[in-house]
A protein has these predicted regions:
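Acidic-enriched, low-complexity/disordered segments with a strong bias for Aspartate over Glutamate
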Residues: 2, 14, 33, 58-59, ...
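ADP-ribosyltransferase catalytic core
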Residues: 216-285
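Residue-identity detector for threonine
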Residues: 16-17, 49, 69-73, 139, ...
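ADP-ribose/NAD+-binding catalytic cleft of ART/PARP-like enzymes
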Residues: 20, 77-227
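Compositionally biased, intrinsically disordered low-complexity regions
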Residues: 44, 78, 82, 203, ...
């Protein structure tokens, strides 16, 4: 698929966003070079109690605990093993209260599903959230998505809208996860700067279209609207012989390994990155 066709696909996408920046700008490599702060409209205002509490906390561990407690209170979810509440974990098998037995969608379940298969139903919901909030459509879900009127697009839409995952205000949960990540990253800016140097291992560029070659090893690639990176180059080599190295602005980070003490992405230290066009340096592992 050539660069002109790809650009057309993005231009036909939903250019409206909930972060105050047009999707064409968010999609560009230029945004990554000179990012501006992003906030999802109304989230901090609607959850003022949480962010007032966070403003009183200096310790990162206490901040994470405050966030987890707030999510448990607001959405009836928990951060313990398997995403179950303490009451459910301590109850004998089959003795969980009836009101707790039905499936309760949560951001932790989505992260766990992503860790297992980023092209599964949970991955579709996460990509759908990015599409809704940032106006960036996915370019890959199980296989390349080249046009809207296609079986590939229809399959993605069917999975992202599954009623199983859209109970319990799941996108509002993801809004809060993003805003909490931005709150934490803003407080680390003095030590990390505006960008994180991240790595992604691939075996080919089937999922990442090359838009422009800048130098022998430096290219602009179009990443899927949500992708996994890692801060550890050695970990990236587990997933492919070609290592993409990118400077990712804080504003395009949904989740990172040390954000919460309990989550399903611990093993590989994943960072969930909002996609678009990125300048990357490609080397062999």
């Amino acid at each position: 698929m050539d660069a002109e066709a790809l650009q057309g696909a993005w231009q036909r996408g939903d250019s409206t966003t909930l972060v105050g920046v047009p999707s064409a700008r968010l999609n560009s490599a230029a945004f990554n070079d000179e990012p501006v702060p992003l906030h999802i409209a109304g989230v901090r205002e609607a959850n003022e109690t949480l962010f007032v509490l966070l403003s009183l906390v200096d310790d990162p561990g206490l901040a994470s605990s405050a966030f987890e407690t707030y999510m448990t209170t607001m959405f009836g979810i928990a951060s313990g093993p398997g995403g179950k509440s303490r009451r459910a974990r301590e109850a004998p098998d089959g003795d969980e209260p009836p009101e707790r037995r039905h499936y309760r969608a949560s951001y932790l379940r989505l992260l766990r599903g992503w860790a297992y298969d980023s092209n599964g139903p949970e991955g579709a919901v996460l990509k759908g959230w990015v599409e809704s909030r940032f106006g960036l459509v996915p370019t890959f879900h199980k296989e390349p998505i080249r046009r809207f009127a296609s079986p590939q697009w229809a399959r993605y839409v069917e999975e992202k809208m599954s009623s199983r995952f859209h109970s319990n205000a799941i996108w509002s949960q993801l809004d809060l996860l993003y805003e909490f990540a931005q709150w934490v990253l803003a407080r680390r800016r003095a030590e990390t700067g505006r960008h994180l140097l991240l790595f992604r291992g691939v075996n080919d560029f089937d999922e990442h279209q090359i838009i422009e070659r800048l130098e022998k090893r430096t290219v602009i690639v179009r990443l899927n609207n949500l992708v996994s990176f890692t801060a550890d180059r050695d970990v990236a080599t587990w997933f492919g012989d070609i290592i993409m190295e990118a400077a990712v602005p804080h504003e395009k980070i949904l989740f990172f390994n040390t954000l919460l003490p309990h989550h399903p992405l611990k093993g590989e230290g994943e960072v969930l990155v909002i996609g678009g066009d990125y300048k990357v340096r490609a080397t062999y592992g």
